[in-house]
């Protein structure tokens, strides 16, 4: 009790009152300073303090927006730490474990949500909800393989990999990014299945040329095995996908439950592993991410923080001056978030990062191997579990090879400072001084279970044509 009394000895009554609703018991001093800074802003607005207290004291009751002026960069500094205001106060009064603004969505009643970019921003913690990971529907794998070998996509996949441009195309966020093109899969005329978005010629890619994506299926292939009725992949998937079981008989009226084996998605202990490379040399051990928020930076942190992968600690006897210089510029590096079934990469470094994600490229209508540049202070969604689930569900009826091809989508490559591709003198990621490879465990393990259920491929998987 003595320590608590000393803590609040110089605290104003208004701050004390608001701290009474604080959640969690960590970082008392930081929370006090955050609330004190807020009180000073709200006192200038008539009725704002009363409205905030009403919202905090009656969580289930409707409340008005409680706003503060938006700063130039949108962030608020509290005791040497900068953060987004709605995240700070949601952390203080609702969710102490909140990591990122990607975990929050405003309620419809909020007139000044952070994302609206207005001059005022609402910090009422009860005007935001936390994003929950959507439940992915199981993939229905046919028990008896009725797949026609003539429909095999293996030849198409091989042709694609042989004809992929020697140097990947490049795109820069946000300049090259538009709404995904919703050209549907070519399906047979009588197909009862809704179209899925794709892009037959990668319309958003610079100088589009070459073969179609492995996900554009020839018109004579059998229809997808299962997919949700709403075409949500061209949207930003802000609404959870309907995963109720009653959609299965509507979509698959001719397939009984005895003919298919459902294979469910399971969340692994570690959502990803990260491996660090210098040129074509792997350096150090893999980092296994258990925290949904992971920092990969160029510093040294001997504390063995489970949410931080410090590249500065790793040594390499083959390191040259170019690598040394690049490592010095990694700085704060990249912040990886895994939120609501989506993976985001936020560039914290002063230098850009460069990302090759087939899932992200598919969503934006780029060629699968396109390398996307993410400038400093920008954030990009690089993987979406729901879109992957829909692709996997469609692929099972196209044979083992079609499903196996999706393993490429579960690995994301990212270089620091130096880019690669058609617009750079480095043609391949292994020519960049410092890069990481991210393996997404959940999707990979799901693929493994589906492939095991499907049995052997009709043709052996081989690197030899």
From Swiss-Prot:
GO terms for biological process: anatomical structure morphogenesis; BMP signaling pathway; bone development; cardiac conduction system development; cardiac muscle contraction; cartilage development; cell differentiation; embryonic pattern specification. One of its GO terms (cellular component) is cytosol. Signal peptide: none annotated. Residues 163-249 are annotated as: Disordered. It is found in: Cytoplasm; Nucleus; Mitochondrion. Pfam families: MH1 (PF03165), MH2 (PF03166). The modification N-acetylthreonine is found at residue 2. SUPFAM superfamilies: SMAD MH1 domain, SMAD/FHA domain. Residues 13-137 form the MH1 domain. InterPro entries: Dwarfin, MAD_homology1_Dwarfin-type, MAD_homology_MH1, SMAD-like_dom_sf, SMAD_dom_Dwarfin-type, SMAD_FHA_dom_sf, SMAD_MH1_sf. Coiled coil: none annotated. The keyword Phosphoprotein applies. The modification Phosphoserine is found at residues 463, 465. GO terms for molecular function: DEAD/H-box RNA helicase binding; DNA-binding transcription factor activity; DNA-binding transcription factor activity, RNA polymerase II-specific; DNA-binding transcription repressor activity, RNA polymerase II-specific; I-SMAD binding; metal ion binding; RNA polymerase II cis-regulatory region sequence-specific DNA binding; sequence-specific double-stranded DNA binding. Transcriptional regulator that plays a role in various cellular processes including embryonic development, cell differentiation, angiogenesis and tissue homeostasis. Upon BMP ligand binding to their receptors at the cell surface, is phosphorylated by activated type I BMP receptors (BMPRIs) and associates with SMAD4 to form a heteromeric complex which translocates into the nucleus acting as transcription factor. In turn, the hetero-trimeric complex recognizes cis-regulatory elements containing Smad Binding Elements (SBEs) to modulate the outcome of the signaling network. This is Mothers against decapentaplegic homolog 5. It comes from Homo sapiens (Human).
């Amino acid at each position: 009790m003595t320590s608590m009394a000393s803590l609040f000895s110089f605290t104003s009554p208004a701050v004390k009152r608001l701290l009474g609703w604080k959640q969690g018991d960590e970082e008392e001093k930081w929370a006090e300073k955050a609330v004190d800074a807020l009180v000073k802003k709200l006192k200038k607005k008539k009725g704002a303090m009363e409205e905030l207290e009403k919202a905090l004291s009656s969580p289930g009751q409707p409340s008005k927006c409680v706003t503060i002026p938006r700063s130039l960069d949108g962030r608020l500094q509290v005791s040497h730490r900068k953060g987004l205001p709605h995240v700070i106060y949601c952390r203080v009064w609702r969710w102490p474990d909140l990591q990122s603004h990607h975990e929050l969505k405003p309620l419809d009643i909020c007139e000044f949500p952070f994302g609206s970019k207005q001059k005022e921003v609402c910090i009422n913690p009860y005007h935001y909800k936390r994003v929950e990971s959507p439940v992915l529907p199981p993939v229905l794998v046919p028990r008896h393989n009725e797949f026609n070998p003539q429909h095999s996509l293996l030849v198409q996949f091989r042709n694609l990999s042989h004809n992929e441009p020697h140097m990947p195309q490049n795109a820069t966020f946000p300049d090259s990014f538009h709404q995904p093109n919703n050209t549907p899969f070519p399906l047979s005329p009588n197909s009862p299945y809704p179209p899925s978005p794709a892009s037959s010629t990668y319309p958003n890619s610079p100088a589009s040329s070459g073969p179609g994506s492995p996900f554009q299926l020839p018109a004579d292939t059998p229809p997808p095995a299962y997919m949700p009725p709403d075409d949500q992949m061209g949207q930003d998937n802000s609404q959870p996908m309907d995963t109720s079981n009653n959609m299965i008989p509507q979509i698959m009226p001719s397939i009984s439950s005895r003919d298919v084996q459902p294979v469910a998605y399971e969340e692994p202990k570690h959502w990803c592993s990260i491996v660090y490379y210098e040129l074509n040399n792997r350096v150090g051990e893999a980092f296994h991410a258990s925290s949904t928020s992971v920092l990969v930076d160029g510093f040294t942190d001997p504390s063995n923080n489970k949410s931080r992968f410090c590249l500065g600690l790793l040594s390499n006897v083959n390191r040259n001056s170019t690598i040394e210089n690049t490592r010095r510029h990694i700085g704060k590096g990249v912040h990886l978030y895994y939120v609501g079934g989506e993976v985001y990469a936020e560039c914290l470094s002063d230098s850009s990062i460069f990302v090759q994600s087939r899932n992200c490229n598919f969503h934006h209508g780029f060629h699968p191997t396109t390398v996307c540049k993410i400038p400093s202070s920008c954030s990009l969604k690089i993987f979406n579990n729901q879109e992957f689930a829909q692709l996997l569900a469609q692929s099972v009826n196209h044979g083992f090879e079609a499903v196996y091809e999706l393993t490429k989508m579960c690995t994301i490559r990212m270089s620091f400072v130096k880019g690669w591709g058609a617009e750079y003198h480095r043609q391949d990621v292994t020519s960049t001084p410092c890069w990481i490879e991210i393996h997404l465990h959940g999707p990979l393990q799901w693929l493994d279970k589906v492939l095991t259920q499907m049995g052997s491929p009709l043709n052996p998987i081989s690197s030899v044509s």
